[in-house]
Amino acid sequence: MVAAKTRTAAAPTRQRILDEAERLIAVKGVYGFTLQDIAAPLGVRVPAIYKHYLNRDGVLIEVSRRFIALLAGQFELRPELGAVAAFQVALDSFVELMMGHPAYVRLALVDFATPGGGMDYVKLAAGGSFKENLVRGPLAAMHARLRALLQAGVRSGDFRAVDATDVYRLLKAALLIRLVFPDDTLLLRQPHSREVRDTKRWIREIAARHLAPRRDAAIDPVHKPRRALGPTRRSARKP
């Protein structure tokens, strides 16, 4: 797991607390650990955590801020690439984020299950609910970039016109469920490179089928030359 791999004795205590919290969320769940569980592996006592965070909720809010900050950087624009290739890179990055930070998968699932647009930890970190972040807050720019990527595909003739929020719903829901159903073993250990590649390919195929222009609906978009979102070098740049 990324959190476990990046944790070192030389890291500031505040960072090490968050790294350990991420690890525990991944293996025990959002509500399955205590401050003592964080303190013990770090070789400190619980009062040392209170020097940095008011309580356990404070730790979870800060972990959520990490999540929001990384999520806010997703769907980066790649003007040097063609529309399909740029979207492929964005999809791959999204998969890497969630598979590299299994705690964020747990947080997202609990967040979705909380009435009122999300649980307080993530709402505080994001400055509002899911809906509010579509147009303002730290995630607004990410949603705007996703819209721009999709619009570029429409202009190039590679994508049909679709609502960006629907695409985000589809991608996030599909990825989260793949990582926890029928089991969540991918959250409990470092994924193998093959598992990451397979997941990227799977997400690309889902996106390809959803975005394929209607006139090509009878053609498998994954294998269609120059239109695929699957792994192909030919679509990396438009002529």
What are these regions (language model features)?
Residues 99-130, 182-185:
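Amphipathic alpha-helical segments used for helix-helix packing
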Residues 17-25, 67, 71, 94, ...:
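Short hydrophobic clusters on alpha-helical segments that form packing/core surfaces
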Residues 105-109, 132, 136, 154-204, ...:
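Hydrophobic/aromatic-rich alpha-helical bundle segments in the mid-to-C-terminal region
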Residues 62, 76-106, 168-171, 200, ...:
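Hydrophobic alpha-helical connector segments
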Residues 76, 89, 116-156, 165-169, ...:
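Amphipathic alpha-helical packing segments from all-alpha helical-bundle domains
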Residues 1-12, 215-239:
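N-terminal intrinsically disordered/low-complexity leader segments
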Residues 16, 20, 24-58, 62:
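Helix-turn-helix
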Residues 59-67, 142:
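Alpha-helical DNA-contacting segments of helix-turn-helix folds
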